[in-house]
Swiss-Prot record:
The lineage of its organism: Bacteria, Pseudomonadati, Pseudomonadota, Gammaproteobacteria, Oceanospirillales. PANTHER family: D-XYLONATE DEHYDRATASE (PTHR43661), D-XYLONATE DEHYDRATASE YAGF-RELATED (PTHR43661:SF3). Pathway: Amino-acid biosynthesis; L-isoleucine biosynthesis; L-isoleucine from 2-oxobutanoate: step 3/4; Amino-acid biosynthesis; L-valine biosynthesis; L-valine from pyruvate: step 3/4. GO terms for biological process: isoleucine biosynthetic process; L-valine biosynthetic process. The keyword Iron-sulfur applies. It comes from Hahella chejuensis (strain KCTC 2396). GO terms for molecular function: 2 iron, 2 sulfur cluster binding; dihydroxy-acid dehydratase activity; magnesium ion binding. Belongs to the IlvD/Edd family. This is Dihydroxy-acid dehydratase. Its cofactor is [2Fe-2S] cluster; Mg(2+). Binds 1 [2Fe-2S] cluster per subunit. This cluster acts as a Lewis acid cofactor.
Amino acid sequence: MPEYRSSTTTKGRNMAGARALWRATGMKTEDFSKPIIAVVNSFTQFVPGHVHLKDLGQLVCREIEAAGGVAKEFNTIAVDDGIAMGHDGMLYSLPSREIIADSVEYMANAHCADALVCISNCDKITPGMLMAALRLNIPAIFVSGGPMEAGKTKLSEHKLDLVDAMVIAADSSASDELTEEYERSACPTCGSCSGMFTANSMNCLTEAIGLSLPGNGTTLATHSDREQLFLTAARRIVDLTKRYYQDEDTSVLPRSIASFKAFENAMTLDIAMGGSTNTILHLLAAAQEAEVDFSMTHIDHLSRKVGQFCKVAPNTPKYHIEDVHRAGGIMAILGELDRAGLLHTDVPTVHSDTMKDALDAWDVMRNNDPELHKFFKAGPAGIPTQQAFSQSTRWSSLDLDRENGCIRSAEHAFSKEGGLAVLYGNIAEDGCIVKTAGVDESILLFKGKARIFESQDDAVKGILNDQVKEGDVVIIRYEGPKGGPGMQEMLYPTSYLKSKGLGKACALLTDGRFSGGTSGLSIGHCSPEAAAGGAIGLIEEGDEIIIDIPNRGINVSLTPEQLKARRQAMEAKGADAWKPAQPRPRKVTTALKAYALLATSADKGAVRDKELLK
């Protein structure tokens, strides 16, 4: 049977020094025959999605040790994309994903950890830890901090979130008093922001890919039910670890669970729930770590056959993550996908032998167990707090309306085509992404004149100064992984377009990316990016752009000969080719330059180019 990795540091006379150091951490002689399980926490006081995690790592550690393991906790970094948004701080967000993945690898390999419990929550932390778990391929389980409760003002029952606060702040007709009311009400509790933004999307996808427990993506951070998820994850990782090292059961390893079929399940869920476009970036990156051939081509194929079964903020103001939980959570969406013949149910998970077994136990539409239904009745208390597990409020009933409710059946889907689509054309030969769930039907086919901005900062100024008019296609380029560097999110430009009344009258195209809070005709991840020689860098002011979502097309009205001539003119610039026309007042540090040096375009997940490392 496989030997514990940790035995490298705990066995043999020559490891007396290592054992002495282990003893200094509290280990005893009898512990040297047990698995050492790394509890990878991400507590920080900078991020509301992580501010409540400080004591949860030790909660998991105690339960691991009660179950027969040795637990050792460490923390990764965590960047708050909302706080880093709209300034140079956003340059660091996506690169932090690689640092998180590397830090988990460094700690786990340096200390020969046998398994991982990944306590994640927000935008880059879950994907970073997922990449690390698949890279290491040792037993692992994910348990996130949980979603925030949706906010609301005292004056209205209308639910609020972070994006509402951003939009109203840019609306000159809104009073200072109303703006402050939104600001104070939008984010009332600890947890990841309350809509189907990137953090919640990724935590939901860990359920579909099989590496977290049912309820992980939707049980509120404040609810007492979430404590049981942490305790169960702790006990489960000890079982998974013993199954691998003692029983030689390789089916429990992350790469066995996160197979091609599992990635298809995750992407199918993402499309069905209208998740953040960032999830595509992160799933592509995770697939590379898992050595799974999963690409934009596969995503495009799925997007054409999967409908939208769930619609949540920012795609509608009616529902937030707490409402998805009330409707049965992610297992309920997966159940509807299964009934529609769109799910692989023969794949294993960390909690069930197969996804079919998981659905039989956890889908509220096929299991009437009162305890199961009680679990999904967990709801918000409406009490501002930074304390985990601080309330036990429950809805009086579940939302089981599959015709008009938050989660729909295939027959009554919000739309027959899903919430995400891949577009191709002479602007994006390797593809770009649009969240169709947030696009009004009236602009699914859009023609407009290009309005060029060579940084997000210039675009924000242009929008606020009324330089963008109805019918324009805002082009924000040189903001990709290399060009930014760091592939900034464009939430402020899209929010300001809304505040100017242009949300349904303009399009936005970028080689950067969008926040999970973005809606409207916002097209990102344009690949290849401008800095890598992509055609988005050849578009000129006033060019006609044609966006055809039904036919998955995006093109500039230029002939191949015209594009070739522009490319030759660009390349004739030598060292100044594929750079912004004017230098940007942007401080790019050595750390960011190092990231840019190896970064691939978005169609590859913006991961490091391994060919450059050979």
